[in-house]
């Protein structure tokens, strides 16, 4: 059964790591839904968070292959239930529509979003939340024909237990 899995990999901060890791997804024909790479709490160690829909069998094989990459220190996969996940999204709406429609203000309040910039041409609204919440707010703005631009971050995660404690033990 296909479902969303989130792979968290810790690697040494070396040139080419992103390419080596994503190449394994490409070889297995797995579409990456979300990708975030950042410094971990340990200097010189990068944290990759990769979200994709696949089967458990495929993700097991992929993680085994990821463990064979030289600079990969630790790699595990998780379901959404095991993690605290958030994304950030920015929605651009023309100022004229914003001024003339009370709908935008209602949507901003309803989705617990916030206005981060207003000028004569446009209004930028920021929403932090789950992928589902961000998609639902986007869908509502699109249905009302209010949205002119949209962008989102990759998934940011924290494990409900301490993943980095395990990492420290592996160093």
Where are these regions (language model features)?
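Long, contiguous binding/interaction regions
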Residues: 1-47, 53-171
């Amino acid at each position: 059964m296909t479902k969303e899995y989130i792979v968290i990999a810790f690697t040494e901060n070396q040139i080419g790591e992103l390419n080596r890791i994503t190449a394994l997804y490409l070889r297995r024909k797995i579409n990456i839904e979300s990708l975030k790479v950042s410094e971990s709490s340990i200097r010189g160690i990068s944290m990759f968070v990769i979200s994709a829909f696949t089967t458990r069998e495929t993700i097991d094989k992929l993680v085994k292959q990821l463990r064979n990459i030289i600079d990969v220190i630790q790699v595990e996969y998780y379901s959404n239930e095991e993690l605290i996940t958030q994304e950030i999204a920015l929605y651009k709406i023309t100022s004229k529509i914003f001024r003339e429609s009370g709908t935008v203000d209602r949507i901003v309040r309803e989705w617990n979003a916030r206005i981060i910039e207003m000028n004569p041409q446009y209004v930028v609204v920021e929403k932090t939340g789950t992928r589902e919440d961000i998609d639902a707010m986007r869908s509502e703005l699109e249905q009302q024909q209010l949205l002119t631009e949209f962008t989102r971050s990759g998934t940011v995660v924290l494990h409900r237990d301490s993943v980095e404690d395990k990492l420290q033990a592996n160093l």
